[in-house]
A protein has these predicted regions:
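C-terminal transmembrane-bundle signature of multipass membrane proteins
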Residues: 13-22, 52-53, 180-266
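Juxtamembrane "helix-exit" motif on the non-cytosolic side of transmembrane helices
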Residues: 20-32, 91-104, 164-175, 227-237
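Membrane-interface helix-boundary motifs at transmembrane edges
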Residues: 63-74, 138-151, 201-211
Length: 266
């Protein structure tokens, strides 16, 4: 039995409805924080403990874990959806950056310029990463994924890391903002998931790749789906842009679907 898969199911049953309830009853729209209380503490503790157990279970079972793709059609759809959302988000961000530059063309402070460059690089990487996932989706559809070049997956890794840096820049108090903390954790897990993802598709150190996608794929899906549930239930006071919510949802589903191909030998 794959312990991580079992722990993910338990985590989803506990954390998703609990965070949804807290988002409705304990969320302060003005501060972006959850009000302190027993349930809030229980949620954070459960999320942290279960995530650690998922990681530990995967690494303890490393030698027993195996990987075999049995849902290539589903992965094809999810990869193309994720790629499409990434491209749309990147293009939208580039247009906004272009308009911002045109509006302040006469006077662009150095501090603002560095932010524009970071946002621009992140948007470009989003577009390139989207193209990578669309191509991967086509490969899944045609069932031609053996020995796929893993070098192209450096672009999604760069995009995710730039998105994390941009989030820290815009929200220094991110640790107290549950939806952005979950977003950040999802991106970090996605980055590490891609390390295993590229090893599997490139057929390089397959065992290590299987362990990494099993560990970080399920954790990333847990963080992303938990965040999505909270944002959907608090749609009227949603603090994240709708595009980000859709992106995290698509990203989480892809991580989950890919990681579900792992199993443990008896």
């Amino acid at each position: 039995m794959n312990w991580t898969k079992l722990l993910f199911a338990i985590s989803a049953v506990i954390c998703l409805p609990l965070y949804g309830f807290l988002s409705i009853t304990r969320f302060d729209a003005q501060t972006g924080f959850l009000t302190a209380g027993t349930l809030t503490t229980v949620f954070y503790a459960a999320l942290a403990v279960l995530a650690v157990l998922m990681l530990a279970g995967s690494f303890l079972q490393k030698k027993q874990l195996r990987f075999s793709i049995f849902n290539s059609r589903l992965l094809a759809v999810l990869a193309m959806v994720l790629g499409g959302v990434l491209v749309l988000c990147g293009v939208f961000d580039l247009l906004n950056i272009g308009y911002a530059i045109l509006d302040s063309l006469d006077f662009l402070p150095a501090a603002l310029l560095s932010g524009v460059l970071l946002s621009g690089a992140q948007a470009v990487m989003a577009v390139v990463s989207g193209i990578v996932f669309v191509r991967l989706g086509v490969s899944f559809l045609l069932e031609r994924i053996a020995n796929r070049s893993s070098i192209t997956f450096i672009f999604p890794v760069i995009w995710a890391l730039l998105a994390c840096v941009e989030m820290f820049r815009d929200y220094p108090q991110i640790a107290g903002m549950p939806e952005r903390t979950l977003y950040l954790l999802c991106l970090l897990c996605f980055t590490l998931f891609l390390m295993g993802h590229s090893r599997i598709l490139g057929d390089v150190d397959f065992a290590k790749g299987t362990c990494w996608i099993n560990a970080f794929g399920f954790c990333g899906a847990l963080f992303g789906l938990t965040m999505t549930v909270g944002e959907v239930l608090c749609f009227s006071s949603m603090t994240l842009p709708l595009s980000d919510v859709l992106l995290v949802f698509a990203l989480s589903l892809y991580c989950l679907a890919f990681s579900f191909n792992t199993y443990a030998d008896r």
